[in-house]
Amino acid sequence: MRFFLTFLLFLFTLFSLFVYDFLRKKNFYLDLDLDIRTRTVKELILNLERFFGLNLYLNFKDIKFEKIIKIEKGKVVVVSFKKRKKKKKFLLKNIPIREIPINLKIGHLDVWTGNEGGVNRVIVKDASLINNELEGEFLYTNLRSFTLNGSIKAKIQRDTLTLKDLLLDSEYFSAKTKGEIKRNTGEILAEVEIKEIRKENFTLSGTKINAKGTINLPVLDINAKAFVKDLIVRNKNYGSIEGIVKGNYELFDKLFLKGEAVNPEGTKIKFTYDVIPEGLLTFSFENLVVDKNTLGINREIRGEFHGNGKVDFKKMFVKVNAFTENLEVIDKKFKGDVLFSYNFSGNGSLNFEFKNSGYAKGNLIINKNKLEGEFSFNDFPVVFQDFNAYLSGEGKFKKGKIFEMEAKIFANNGQFRDFSLQRISSDVKIRDKEIEALVYYGNSFGFVKGKFDNLKGFIQLNNFSLEGKEKSIKISHGSIEFSIQGKSINSKGKLGDLALNLSNIYAKTELEFNFNKKNEKITLEGNGILNVRFKEKSVLENFKYSLLLLDNNLRIFGASKDSILRVVYYISGRSGEFYGKIDKKEFGISLNGEIKNKDVKANFEAFYALLREKIKIKGKIETKEDQVKISLFPTQLRGKRFNYRFNGLNVFLEKENLSVEFKGLDVSLLDKKLLSISPSKGVGTTKNFSFEPVKITGVLNGVLNIAYKGNLYLKSSGTLNLTLLSKHIGSLMKSQMFGKLDYEFVFDGNELKFLARNDEPVRINSLYFYEPFGSAMNLELRKDFFAFALTGWFREGFLNAYAISKNFRDFEVEFVYKNLPVKLKDGIRARIEADGKGKVVVKNFKEIFLTLDTLLDGYVKVKKLPEKKEEEKKTLPVEITLDINFKTENGLIVKLPEGRVYTALNGRIYGKLPEPYYEIDVVLKSGRLEYFGRKFFVKRSTVKLLKEKDKELTEFDFYLNTVSDGYKIFLLVHGTPENPSVYYFSEPPLSREQILFKLISGGVNEGILPVGTVLANELKALGYVKGTIERLFDVNVEIGIKTSSTGEVGALVKLKKKLGSYFSLYYQTASTKDKKDTFWGAEVRSPGSLDLGFSFNVYSDNTREYKLRYVREFDF
């Protein structure tokens, strides 16, 4: 205690004699509250102004002088008000590290430092220096809101400072440092992590840096390695960057860094940074890829840039040069460069130029608060979000106190999303807050003029169109007027023939509307006529509708002959009701319900016509807060061919939780069970959902798995029982199949795969072939691909067919066959062996092309030819074009009702159905036919059938001969069916009449060839024969022909002899088979005016017939 007081007295004496007078001149202030008894300084205040360019303020409280000096609380403020003069170079060759003989604890110390560069603050907490071991926590902040938390553990031992743990943590990075420092050497290791940065279009993942510092005074050498996993600019990831940094730091004099970084894409960046004393950063880059992902657009653009730049922090200047040799925009490549310079005083410039077959160039001058620039384009592809086009034009702008711009721009070959655009031209002028713009789009145009808060304009539409892949928007004509005043908008318009075409949906409407918005009040009125088609089927036709939004009430009404819509919604009350119905022959749907707040209740009913039956479903929909319930009620159908029983379906959704209960389905065809699908339940969320395995039995036997994980997933495998299927549809197909197909089905989002094949041969009995055959089938179905292969083998023949499609609208089918045993029925029976090949091409389900080359041999039996019926020409749903070439190799045996002929064919059928052209030559090589009970032998005869654009005919030449009573008779029947003629002669020669009587002496069989008919018609030439017989025998002769109901044609000869005035005898003979055509009889007539007669006939079958006739005239 005595030593402590003596030491304080000594210090006070020195302070009074030597220091006080000097400090007093420096505005020195000292306030000391000392408690000598407890060796405690309760408070120490020191204020010193203009002390070597510093203002210094200290305030310490509760300083206790014990074995460990304790400072409970303190504050230090140091403010510099003089600029430092450049000092001479100072080399620190060693650090005065030595053990400190005192122990110290500080509870809270607040240190403030400030100069013209800013203010810094360090708060030290719970710091201690005991036995040369240092521990403590600190918090650093500055006026830029940068905050750094830290803690330190270190130890001083002799001349060595061991840094056990220095931990730093901030919003942007954290670090962990260890090391050992001696008087002139040392090593420091640091692990630094740059924290993740996420901005709107920029993401930098957490970056790790491992650094090592080697001290060899006066120099500190720095080596660091860094790895950046993700560096994302919009949708482009420049990540997986590896970099190294090297440098050296001469304490208080120089700091120099250099480094480089590279990523897997080949981008390389190098830099040098002279931090002290020059403050100069230079850098270069290579292969910096800029593409559609970098720019966040949906159009192809890509370029690799290289360049260099520098930043001079002393002169406050930045300059960057960038170049590219291959900027690919849409379908063109450009060379170009970009030059940017700027000094921090506010002056700078930007120049760019890209050129090839087209070009884009421009310049911008920055002069503090003024901007001035110009630009020009020529056939330059421009991409902005979902819009791209080739631009030509020029413009200029400047901004000082006001903004001014003039530009004329033309856009060709434009595209917006999937739509192709017509030519666009624009002329725009802006001055201050006023704009005047004229825009042309194809034959349409628009104009706007006024201040930005008071605009008026109009749009005139003429053949406006947006064309896309399988979709389009077209407006034949229309006009729209609009004005904008502050928050008020007024618009009215009329659109004629607004047509929307989306794949299978086509909608067309005419619309008139008025729209007004004033503050928050909106009025909308419109009406029109709507037509909608789905897959060429009419859904809505001449649907007249109107809508009205007035006083927060929305009303929509619409109707046509088979549909109706009614919606009423009260916006202020958040309630309404709706009703809609479509009632077509093929399908129908009705829906009615109500809306209250966000809750909806609706009942619906729908049907679809399938196999001449109506498949119906009924159900209801309910929504309440976060819940949605959908129920399909059980329904059943018992039709003539098709039956089903649907047991119901329930869907429940609450927020994202989803559950489904499917209660099963049974399907029957022709009263036979076709398919059963077992009940199943599914649970999950709207993002992840799955069903219990669904069992399928019947014609299909297998298991179906259903799941949803971002995409719908379906998987099924099993067998298709063709034997069972034939029992259901065999009568329709006129075939029976015996066997099965193994199938596999997978659907995963947009990917579809269906495979089916048979391991064992499938046996087929078909009415179209006169022998059963075995077959192999292979089917492959994918999202944009279809293929089917069929091989059939017979005893001596085969059939191979292959079908393929790449878009499910266009198909190609190729087939080849040999010794194909074809069988025909329905009036013409045939057993034909055919060799050939062919192809069927289907285009968009609207056109079918069939080409076929085939050889025919075999046997044909014709009972009768189908009668031609005159029907109205019907338009086929598709256009079918034929090109069929056929001929016989060995010939065809044709069995007709009148006999048998051996024929050869050669022909072509071509053109479009239902009236194709044809050219067919038929040769009857030989044969035997029977007419009038007589056999005729066929010699080489021909038939020619021809139909061309302006010509249609059938010509024939039949050569026949027969033998009668030792006479050979030769016939030639030739001509056309409408005008046939016959030529005949005999050996030995007979007269024409004699030949005919010999030919028709027997009966006539029904025939296909026109021989019998021609001969019967030839009897009309016998008129003069009749007269000769009447004169020779004094009898009345009648000659004629008769055609029976069966088609039999024969000759009739009737002789009649009068015996007096009232009695006659007669005799009739015929060449037909009918017994009633040959008879004899007598007739008696009364004398005078009384018309009374009696006759009898005795037929060839000995039956008799008696007739009494009385005729009397009455005068009324």
Curated annotation (Swiss-Prot):
The chain crosses the membrane at residues 3-20. Keywords: Membrane, Transmembrane, Transmembrane helix. One of its GO terms (cellular component) is plasma membrane. It is a single-pass membrane protein. Signal peptide: none annotated. GO terms for biological process: protein secretion. It is found in: Membrane. It comes from the Bacteria. InterPro entries: TamB (IPR007452). Pfam families: TamB (PF04357). This is Uncharacterized protein aq_2054. It comes from Aquifex aeolicus (strain VF5).
